[in-house]
């Protein structure tokens, strides 16, 4: 992946809903990022999103000039995509001005961190979703692809926009729907300027190893032993109970 290293970030507007504390002890109950604007010279491309507590609420498809809501429940709301298009146009103008005035120093490429896990506990043959979390992304230019047994997978794949972090880096999540099988393994392939070569994060379903014949024999023997002990103990208690009843009858009334 040959990528141009010229990059410029747009303004990041954050609105924070704070808990009613004061001074240095203020802790955020919820954090909303309204109008996360990103424009870069690579591509060139831009991004406009709204986020709440780290989740993407919607983004504006700049090519189709429409708002895309990430959850069906949010589609009752409206957002004029023209607002985002205007913001991106302003960022593009500012970027061009800054490039002319700068010495074109490249941004520092951070090394992304990749984690792969399943959405729910894995049962072979039952639908599930693999999640590839790519964290610490900067600059926000990355390729994320899925491989199954070494072959590229395109069906059932979706991903988020670049989601902002407080340290001004980004993270991105890619999803893969699948039917887990003992014959298939998966890799999340990540390409980024901060990596010397593409990074592959491997995942395969964990299948409990079958018990050996010796283990099965030991388990059966232990179960049989416990059962026999229970029978013997129960018999002893029954005999003692019968003897106690017989003794009380022979004593008769005082």
From Swiss-Prot:
Tell me what effect the entry lists for residue 70 to R: In allele DQA1*01:01, allele DQA1*01:02, allele DQA1*01:03, allele DQA1*01:04, allele DQA1*01:05, allele DQA1*01:06 and allele DQA1*01:07
Outcome when changing residue 97 to I: In allele DQA1*01:01, allele DQA1*01:02, allele DQA1*01:03, allele DQA1*01:04, allele DQA1*01:05, allele DQA1*01:06, allele DQA1*01:07, allele DQA1*02:01, allele DQA1*03:01, allele DQA1*03:02, allele DQA1*03:03, allele DQA1*04:01, allele DQA1*04:02, allele DQA1*04:04, allele DQA1*06:01 and allele DQA1*06:02
Q: What is the effect of changing residue 230 to C?
A: In allele DQA1*05:07
Query: Ranges in the Cytoplasmic compartment?
Result: 240-254
Q: What is its main location?
A: membrane
Biological processes, Gene Ontology terms: adaptive immune response; antigen processing and presentation of exogenous peptide antigen via MHC class II; immune response; peptide antigen assembly with MHC class II protein complex; positive regulation of immune response; positive regulation of T cell activation
Cysteines paired by S-S bonds: 132-188
- Outcome of residue 34 to C? In allele DQA1*01:01, allele DQA1*01:02, allele DQA1*01:03, allele DQA1*01:04, allele DQA1*01:05, allele DQA1*01:06 and allele DQA1*01:07
- How the protein is affected by changing residue 48 to F? In allele DQA1*02:01, allele DQA1*01:03, allele DQA1*06:01 and allele DQA1*06:02
Instruction: Please list the GO terms describing molecular function.
Output: MHC class II protein complex binding; MHC class II receptor activity; peptide antigen binding
| Entry keyword set | Adaptive immunity, Cell membrane, Disulfide bond, Endoplasmic reticulum, Endosome, Glycoprotein, Golgi apparatus, Immunity, Lysosome, Membrane, MHC II, Signal, Transmembrane, Transmembrane helix
Region Alpha-1, as annotated, extends over 24-119
Region Connecting peptide, residue ranges? 204-216
| Assigned protein family | Belongs to the MHC class II family.
Q: What's the protein here called?
A: HLA class II histocompatibility antigen, DQ alpha 1 chain
The gene designation is HLA-DQA1
